[in-house]
Amino acid sequence: MLKTKRIQQIQEYVFEHESVSLDDLVSVFEVSKNTIRRDVQKLVDEGHIKKVYGGVAVNHVKLESFNERQTRNQFQKRLIAKTAAQYVEDGDVIFIDSGTTTLEMIEFLKDKSITIVTNSLDVIVKALPFDALKVISTGGYLERETQSFSSFNHANSVKNYNFDKVFMASTGISISNGVTNSSPVESEIKETVIKRSTKVFLLADHTKFDKYAMITYCQLHEVDYLITDKVDVSYQHYAKENEITLILAEE
């Protein structure tokens, strides 16, 4: 087996089992412990897994503050947002999720006559100067870490909306665990708006792939359009097999 293929399969195996011993990996992949150690170290260095006593475990993505995330990969996020905005048409009713990439869409939507429903404080503030944008807040209490509005009855505020398109953010994406999020209260509204939309767009830069957070709010095959800056070939194959339109944002 090729080294790159084996490392990918080790990662998937750890993701599936949450934590495994090095001896288990040696047995499953039929290679030496030294080989497993080298393969595991590569995955640790990339941040996908972490070492624990006697083995390895999934490196769950922690909930970072909005400001921490906003400064990362800013150029790529703007390209992705600009590409996503091209799919919005006058008259659309859309949902814009709380996220640093989805937030960037507002600049490219400001001249369109649309209705935006959002759980994001920053989307509301950024849209404020643009009269063409009708903005509806989902309400709830302000979760300062994500600068979004949340409540455990949050889904009730959007369960009767009929969205033309929803533009979703994610903490981590993987084929095995789907589209994930670190906030349980945010995840409920994400699940609901996806069910209420004609088309689901997922906006994510390359750093979000092969990671997952605490809550899966939808499976990857439920996404209609995946917009990113670059993606591994395994996701390209998955998109083709599941009729997901994969769009690479370019200048």
Protein language model regions, located:
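A generic "binding-loop/recognition-motif" signal
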Residues: 62, 101, 123
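HTH-adjacent hinge/linker in prokaryotic transcriptional regulators
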Residues: 2-9, 15-23, 28, 34-98, ...
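Active-site metal-binding loops of divalent metal-dependent hydrolases
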Residues: 99-100, 206
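Conserved phosphate- and dinucleotide-binding cores of soluble alpha/beta proteins
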Residues: 2, 11-12, 19, 125-251
